[in-house]
């Protein structure tokens, strides 16, 4: 395998670059939660095995305009530094676990292709619609919105099949051993398989709940990314006893923090209607607070959480309006946006750039 020159970055959305002198460059743009970070790790690891150069970006909002901004900033850099990219036979933009770019606001390079790996029902743009603009530049389109798929499992399977095709079984099996178990463990949490598949074994349900605490108990998405990459470098796999022990620690520590946050949210709960409640909850605690609230208030059909710049929406499986529609309505009402899954979604209600100019009281007034 070729030797890589690798760099990690603290500023901006750029996280990681790897240069080995490959003939192809992969621009990986992913969401910043556990699923998005795992998706980026899957795409980056496949790039390494294929001996392709890569640059990884992670972004928190998952909004379409932010995907476009990241790509356009890279394109601006490329135009100013043509010698840094003209040697590539192909530059593949790999977008995972987030909205696609705004095609009317991006002018791709001649040798640029696009791949999209997502599972959010509220994000869907049909393949035929993208192909009308991109034509044969649309290289890979893997959108699966049922509970059996998340960004991690979609990128895992897509890269496994690509490695099988390009490098053969040996390379594909190495990739499988490194990332399959972890990716499917992420899926247990991210699409709420642990809660919504009754026949799931109890140990899988427990693991699913635990996985949801990982990105909440680590400093940042960049720290999570670097940690997973370091484990892969050291242990050659994420399916390792030390990793599962770390998950247990995250879960236990998170539970203690959530109990206090839940008590605070319950005291300040706003009853919107007989079936809808609004709770104040930081993103870090929102999932567990929603779970505990639903356990104690089974008649509620919708739980909305909010914090300084946005919030989340949960609806029960029998509720008539999908969560992503409610989230979109709230977000657009604040001149922002929202989306996600049928029963779990998120929204923005305060532009974080504007938030820099507001004091704490003003921020609370916005939400």
Where on the chain are the PLM-derived regions?
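Long, charge-rich alpha-helical interaction segments
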Residues: 198, 210-253
């Amino acid at each position: 395998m070729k030797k890589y020159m690798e760099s990690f970055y603290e500023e901006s959305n750029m996280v990681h670059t790897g240069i080995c002198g490959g003939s192809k460059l992969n621009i990986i743009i992913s969401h910043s939660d556990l699923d998005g970070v795992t998706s980026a790790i899957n795409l980056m690891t496949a790039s390494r095995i294929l001996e392709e150069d890569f640059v990884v970006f992670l972004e928190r909002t998952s909004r379409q305009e932010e995907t476009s901004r990241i790509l356009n900033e890279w394109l601006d850099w490329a135009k100013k530094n043509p010698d840094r990219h003209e040697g590539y036979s192909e530059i593949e933009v790999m977008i995972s676990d987030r909205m696609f770019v705004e095609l009317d606001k991006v002018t791709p390079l001649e040798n640029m292709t696009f791949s999209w790996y997502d599972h959010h029902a509220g994000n869907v743009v049909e393949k035929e619609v993208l192909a009308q603009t991109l034509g044969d530049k649309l290289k890979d389109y893997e959108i699966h919105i049922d509970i059996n798929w998340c960004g991690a499992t979609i990128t895992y399977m897509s890269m496994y099949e690509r490695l099988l095709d390009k490098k053969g079984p040996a390379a594909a099996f190495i990739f499988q051993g490194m990332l399959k178990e972890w990716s499917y463990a992420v899926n247990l949490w991210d699409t709420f398989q642990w809660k919504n598949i009754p026949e799931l074994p109890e140990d899988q349900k427990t693991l699913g709940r635990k996985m949801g605490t990982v990105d909440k108990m680590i400093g940042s998405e960049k720290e999570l990314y670097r940690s997973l990459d370091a484990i892969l470098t050291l242990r050659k796999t994420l399916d390792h006893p030390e990793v599962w022990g770390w998950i247990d620690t995250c879960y236990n520590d998170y539970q203690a923090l959530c109990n206090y946050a839940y008590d605070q949210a319950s005291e300040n709960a706003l009853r919107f209607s007989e079936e809808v409640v609004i709770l104040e909850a930081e993103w870090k605690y929102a999932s567990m607070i929603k779970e505990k609230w639903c356990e104690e208030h089974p008649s509620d059909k919708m739980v909305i959480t909010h914090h300084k710049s946005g919030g989340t929406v949960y609806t029960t499986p029998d509720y008539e309006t999908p969560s992503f529609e409610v989230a979109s309505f709230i977000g657009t009402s604040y001149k922002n946006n929202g989306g996600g899954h049928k029963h779990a979604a998120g929204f923005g209600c305060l532009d974080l750039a504007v938030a820099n100019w507001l004091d704490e009281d003003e921020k609370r007034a916005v939400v």
